[in-house]
Amino acid sequence: MIRIGHGFDVHAFGQDRPLMICGVEVPYHTGFIAHSDGDVALHALTDALLGAVALGDIGKLFPDTDMQYKNADSRKLLIEAYRQVRAQGYKVANVDVTIIAQAPKMRPYIDQMRQTIADDLQCDAMQVNVKATTTEKLGFTGRGEGIACEAVALLIKQ
């Protein structure tokens, strides 16, 4: 049996912290306003994984009202969510992540992002795709106010 999940997340810029995308620190003058480290890509991916096995979403598993997740490393959240996916008897066939941002440019970091996700999901980097696009200066991402991300996860029965 195969299962598919979709995730979406968005965070605004504005906090003095590192900008984390797909578990990689991307040089930029500001970070995200968020309860955790704000990694929109890993949050969207976590939602996709959880959704594929009907385990809800990142907010259910790691509520932002719980102080233990304050400034949490999103890689740890992804790893825990994937542990729960595996406990349901599924593993990653492939994942696809789309980062929607006017800036900063993601291309120099894509290979590292793919490998980081592959490491966290215990799969080959060829099972992970990360790409970035802009909104041609339209909307909040186009104005440089934040970043959005979508992710899809295809899971197969172990």
Curated annotation (Swiss-Prot):
Segments traversing the membrane: none
Annotated site (Transition state stabilizer): H35, T134
Reactions this protein catalyses: 4-CDP-2-C-methyl-D-erythritol 2-phosphate = 2-C-methyl-D-erythritol 2,4-cyclic diphosphate + CMP
Record SUPFAM superfamilies: IpsF-like
Note describing how the cofactor binds: Binds 1 divalent metal cation per subunit.
Pathway where this protein functions: Isoprenoid biosynthesis; isopentenyl diphosphate biosynthesis via DXP pathway; isopentenyl diphosphate from 1-deoxy-D-xylulose 5-phosphate: step 4/6
Residues annotated for a divalent metal cation binding in this entry: D9, H11, H43
PROSITE patterns: ISPF
Enzyme class of the recorded protein, top EC level: lyase
Binding residues for 4-CDP-2-C-methyl-D-erythritol 2-phosphate: 9-11, 35-36, 57-59, 62-66, 133-136, 140, 143
Matching InterPro entries: MECDP_synthase (IPR003526), MECDP_synthase_CS (IPR020555), MECDP_synthase_sf (IPR036571)
Biological processes, Gene Ontology terms: isopentenyl diphosphate biosynthetic process, methylerythritol 4-phosphate pathway; terpenoid biosynthetic process
Keywords for the protein's UniProt record, in alphabetical order: Isoprene biosynthesis, Lyase, Metal-binding
EC number: 4.6.1.12
GO molecular function term, any single one: metal ion binding
Entry function: Involved in the biosynthesis of isopentenyl diphosphate (IPP) and dimethylallyl diphosphate (DMAPP), two major building blocks of isoprenoid compounds. Catalyzes the conversion of 4-diphosphocytidyl-2-C-methyl-D-erythritol 2-phosphate (CDP-ME2P) to 2-C-methyl-D-erythritol 2,4-cyclodiphosphate (ME-CPP) with a corresponding release of cytidine 5-monophosphate (CMP).
Annotated protein name in UniProt: 2-C-methyl-D-erythritol 2,4-cyclodiphosphate synthase
Organism of derivation: Actinobacillus pleuropneumoniae serotype 5b (strain L20)
